[in-house]
Design a protein with these regions (language model features):
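Active-site glycine/GP-rich loop and adjacent strand/helix microenvironment
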Residues: 1-141
């Protein structure tokens, strides 16, 4: 699978003003940090520190962040860890909120209704979410 390398950090729709740096280039303190699990662990080893938020990036067809990995990121950075799903071109598909009860998706979600949850999220935000059970594969229709 060929993935587009990100040149700029992701802007989370629920935190658009949060300054986020790419884990691959961060070597010191920053407000927010984004990257794959591997990039984030390397960044922590290189001295990167996030003060507010970690955005763990995922791509379709790759394993979703496990609870063990989420706990490891929490231990490394001591800030909330939210999952963000990108397509192979690096475009935002779905994103986790602080309730961590599924991934919120936009109106152009590439998934069928059988994997989307329409009930309100615990965070109070409206809209469809990718069901937690469906996050294991994360493959659009």
């Amino acid at each position: 699978m060929r993935l587009r390398l990100l040149r700029s950090p992701i802007r989370h729709p629920f935190y658009p003003g949060l300054p986020v740096r790419l884990a691959a280039v961060c070597k010191g303190p920053c407000t927010g940090l984004s990257g794959t699990f591997r990039e984030l662990t390397r960044a922590a080893t290189a001295g990167a520190r996030a003060r507010r938020m970690i955005f763990a990036l995922h791509y379709p067809g790759t394993p979703f962040l496990s609870e063990t990995q989420r706990d490891q990121l929490w231990q490394m950075f001591q800030v909330p860890v939210l999952a963000v799903l990108l397509d192979r071109s690096g475009h935002l598909l779905a994103y986790e909120c602080e309730a961590q009860s599924g991934l919120h998706v936009g109106p152009q979600a590439p998934w069928s209704a059988r994997v989307l949850e329409s009930a309100p999220c615990e965070c109070g935000r409206p809209g469809l979410r990718l069901k937690l059970a469906a996050q294991t594969a994360l493959k659009p229709c």
